[in-house]
Amino acid sequence: MKKIGLLTSGGDCPGLNACIRAVVRTANYYNIEVVAFKRGFKGLIENDFTTLDYKSVAGILQKGGTILLTAREPRFKDYNFRKIAYENIQKHNIEALFVIGGNGSFQGAYLLQKDFGLNIIGIPKTIDNDIYGTDYAIGFDTAVNNAMEAIDKIKDTTMSHERIFIVEVMGRDNGFIALEVGIAVGAELTLIPEYPFPLHVIEETILKAKEMGKNFAIIVLAEGVASAKELSEILNERLKDKDVGEIRYQVLGYIQRGGSPSAYDRVMASKFGVFAVEKFVQGEKNFMVAYENGKLLTKPLEISFNKVRIPNLEEYQINNILSM
């Protein structure tokens, strides 16, 4: 019987369990055994594994997080520890390692491919949706919905008390979540790192809203732009004589990464998992599953971390048109 390895690595996100389920059940369908390593690359180094089958993944489709657990493993940067990981993989007679991860995870997995010739198959996941080479990564849709639902509640209070609220969403290096959420909640202003706004433009936008008779405003801020706390303090000081009221802030944080995956994430995670295993069965090696122009395809793993994906300028323009 053929064997494949499976792990989840990096930050968790909704849809991981749906993908695990799809990989395992598709593998079992083709009479392939799945050896799953716990806590990502840490599990490879420590040979901490379990065998998954059709029954063991029952009832996990709708659950957030990952049943395999996940962790960041700095030791994996060291060749000697990667060699230990590879030797553990060899003990199980694994023909390919399936890695459900993001940019960093794929970069680590690629080192196993480069150092030892291991067949690596990547399945993209990250709420940031910033993996180059694919239009979609597992977890993004749920994260956007989580943020939208939270901001809708904040907006009720914002309108009732006639306030301005800066809401910080995840997106350390990119603004994909902020852009989608900004449109979904009708934000007066959306700030992302790719297209920075000068401080005076932010001030002018707030004052313009006031002139238009708006007594409330939602500003969606990607965390990579600035701290919501610091930005609110700066704006409160600079606008204290402008009669715009107190500017408050809220950091949404990890609420965006948790919870039951949306229908879209469940379906996409399932499709990604099935597609990855079927391509392995067909003999393809060393690839990343990608979703492009509505179709699933394979791409070289290294493309995911050699380039940077940035938001579509058209979507950014939509935000600007609809704001205010």
Swiss-Prot record:
Binding positions for ADP per the UniProt entry: R21, A22, V23, V24, R25, K155, G186, A187, E188, K214, N215, F216
Which terms are listed as keywords in the entry? Allosteric enzyme, ATP-binding, Cytoplasm, Glycolysis, Kinase, Magnesium, Metal-binding, Nucleotide-binding, Transferase
A GO term from the CC aspect: 6-phosphofructokinase complex
Give the pathway listed in the UniProt entry for this protein.
Answer: Carbohydrate degradation; glycolysis; D-glyceraldehyde 3-phosphate and glycerone phosphate from D-glucose: step 3/4
On the tree of life, the source organism's domain of life is Bacteria
Listed Pfam families: PFK (PF00365)
Give the EC number(s) under which this enzyme is classified. Answer: 2.7.1.11
Q: Which GO terms describe its biological process?
A: canonical glycolysis; fructose 1,6-bisphosphate metabolic process; fructose 6-phosphate metabolic process
Q: What is this protein called?
A: ATP-dependent 6-phosphofructokinase
Tell me the organism. Sulfurihydrogenibium sp. (strain YO3AOP1)
